[in-house]
Amino acid sequence: AFAGSISDLAALATKGVVVRDITPPSAKVAPANTYAVNGATMMDNYDKYCRFLKAYSMGVHVGNYNLDIIAAMSKAPDGSPAQWEVESVGNSYLAAVAKLQLPPEGDTLYGLVAESAWLTVNNDMKMIGAVDADYDTNDYLTHVFEGCANNFDRAAVEAAADAWMAKNG
């Protein structure tokens, strides 16, 4: 039995290690790809963070548009071909990771702050004695980048991804 992240499980599966995932459901909704930045530093570098998060959102959009393109990019020599040593594991890992990146059903924006997930983390931390109290998510979460992270032309990104796939896929 094993409790851990999707990437840990994928790495074990690639090497033929069969495990039973006992990760608690509440831990599976824990925020993924979290970035912690000092508030002043964040605002001093707002444009840099916006550009990074927009690029990240564009990549997630390509996966939402056509996950096969992300798979092909990942398999390419300048991607992460080692993650595809076992094709079935690579596909399972990609599908699982994609679910963590995509917006909630019915939403079209990427990178939204999942306050409910952070409340779940706080509850789990209280349960194991790591913290004694509830914390106000407004003290450590911000929505300031959600607009700029989604400020891109989705059709243009899709066209560029299709062009890459036609040339390289």
Residue ranges and their predicted role:
Residues A1-Q83:
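Pocket-lining segment of extracytoplasmic ligand-binding domains
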Residues S5, P24, A82, P104, ...:
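Serine/threonine-rich low-complexity intrinsically disordered regions
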Residues D21-I22, N38, A114, Y140-E146:
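Helix N-cap / beta->alpha transition motif
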Residues T34, A40-T41, L109, D134, ...:
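Residue-level preference for alpha-helix termini and adjacent loops
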Residues N45-D132:
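Secondary-structure end/capping motifs
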Residues L119-G169:
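Conserved C-terminal helix/tail region of periplasmic/extracytoplasmic solute-binding proteins
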